From Swiss-Prot:
It is found in: Cell inner membrane. GO terms for biological process: proteolysis. This is Lipoprotein signal peptidase. Belongs to the peptidase A8 family. It catalyses: Release of signal peptides from bacterial membrane prolipoproteins. Hydrolyzes -Xaa-Yaa-Zaa-|-(S,diacylglyceryl)Cys-, in which Xaa is hydrophobic (preferably Leu), and Yaa (Ala or Ser) and Zaa (Gly or Ala) have small, neutral side chains. The gene is lspA. GO terms for cellular component: plasma membrane. It is a multi-pass membrane protein.
């Protein structure tokens, strides 16, 4: 393996592991009973059976296997690209995705806890969801502004 590949893989795997560990630790607080209520944001426990905004909840048990295939596909594609500039954003995305899929296997649904209701009701979400959103924006930026990625080809 080339140094570039080893470095890319190391950064990718460490980022995935870091996001997974942080997210699962946050979620364990809520599974264990922590709650917080305020005028704008409540921290509550919700098990989301679907994906964003509970879409595809009708897929029930199949959803976690479909997501697993998609996530391993993205992981494989990131390895194929072997672009160092994608290692951290891909790690954020994959770490969040693996954590949410893990929830489906362990809890029967994704553990969500942040409920924004200041001015309007927003979907309940978690740290992994935020990391996935940040990663998508970062990856789009790298794709549309190649100058941000020195080894972008």
């Amino acid at each position: 393996m080339h140094n570039k590949t080893v470095r890319h893989l190391t950064i990718l795997i460490l980022t995935i592991a870091g996001i997974f560990i942080i997210d699962q630790n946050i979620k364990s607080l809520f599974v264990d009973g922590y709650r917080y209520y305020s005028d704008c944001i409540d921290l509550i426990l919700v098990y989301n059976k679907g994906v964003a905004f509970s879409m595809f909840a009708f897929l029930d048990e199949s959803l976690k296997y479909i997501q697993l295939v998609l996530v391993f596909g993205v992981f494989g594609y990131m390895l194929y690209l072997n672009q160092l500039c994608y290692a951290i954003p891909a790690g954020l995305m994959l770490g969040g995705a693996f954590s949410n899929i893990y929830d489906r296997f362990i809890h029967g649904g994704v553990v969500d806890m942040v409920y924004w209701h200041c001015g309007f009701d927003f979907a309940v979400f978690n740290f992994a969801d935020v990391m996935i959103d940040v990663a998508v924006v970062w990856i789009l930026l790298l794709n549309f502004k190649p100058k941000f990625c020195k080894n972008h080809s």
